[in-house]
Amino acid sequence: MAYEGGAEDVEVQWFDAEVDRSRFTHGRDAASRAVSQRSRFLASAFEDGVSYLRVSAEDPAALAGIDPERVGGFMKVNNEVVFEARAGHMALEVPWTVIAAPVPGWTSSVFPEDDLAEATERMWSAIFRACRIDQPDPVEAWRTHLADLAARKRHLTDRRYVALRYRGPGTDLEVGLTDRPVWDGGSVTTPEGRPFCPNIPTEEVFTSPHRDRASGRIAATKPLSYFGALIEDFWFEMADGRVVDSGAGGGADVLARILATDGGSARFGEAAMVPQSGAVAAEGLVWKNTLYDENDACHIALGSSYPTCFEGGAALSPDERLAVGLNQSVVHADVVVGSSEVSVHGVLPDGSKEPIILAGEWGFTA
């Protein structure tokens, strides 16, 4: 299909978590500090400004039981290799899309009561519904959905909120925004006018908060699957934009490694609004997959921000982006914080508040 669409060249790369597990289990220490061929390929591709389609087919527990020190060291070294080269993709300068496909480890973790064949069939059915493929006219369904998201991101940008207030079980948080916030989501457009959807499915409208303006406590409402490890029942305490305390019922060591990665990994780079009435949330699943979990409910990302979520941000240098409050990190980890019990209000310059999310649903009409 890519060639039929006019591509000059198509490169297919396979990444296997079992190979990574073998690296950490049997490789020498140097293997956990080496730059992988995968990272070299990605860095080269990003530098060349290629479009890419990533098929996320991951076992959320692929690296369970592996020494987090070895995994964390590998993550840090390899993230640093691709970080600068990835800047154009984070700035939405070239088209890219992430989708997901079932693999045994993933389907069995989501549907543990079923045999593999039944679990796989159920997963494909859920994916088709979440991606609106089951609709009589999927293309028209997507056009309608993207138009709704576009109206909502225009509304939120026009309101010029200075902060977001989160309230829910275990959550009492204020996240300050930058001085010129822009909300994005759904279909986005490159500077050359090429539209694309970074995520399929997509239910979110998001912005990048100010890196120094978060305070309070927030609790995750779903597990975070990160590099083959599962972090569960976790929370953050924020002060002056930084995580100053945290805890987890499972995967606390992995969480600690994420937070300690660099100067921006313990700060927020994204705040996204997602309603519980969306097509992903309607499945009622704990997906254990970042793409699906982040489009299931509101989320906040640790780490790197999106320059396009600041007015004129794409044209700023890295130092200028930092100066206006856009966070920078080799990490971008989406933490799901929304549910039917969580509400988010936008704070206006005069201190008054307006509902954005009320008990998990949109609190405004766009």
Task: Describe every region a protein language model picked out.
Residues 319-366:
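Extended hydrophobic packing segments that form well-structured cores
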Residues 157-159, 227-229, 264, 293, ...:
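Short solvent-exposed loop/turn micro-motifs enriched in small/polar/acidic residues
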Residues 58-60, 103, 171, 180-182, ...:
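Short, glycine-/Ser/Thr-/acidic-enriched flexible segments
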Residues 1-215, 364-366:
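Active-site bordering "gate/hinge" segments
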Residues 245-314:
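Dual-mode signal for accessory low-complexity, basic/Gly-rich regions
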Residues 64-67, 107-112, 186-188, 229-232, ...:
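A short secondary-structure junction signal
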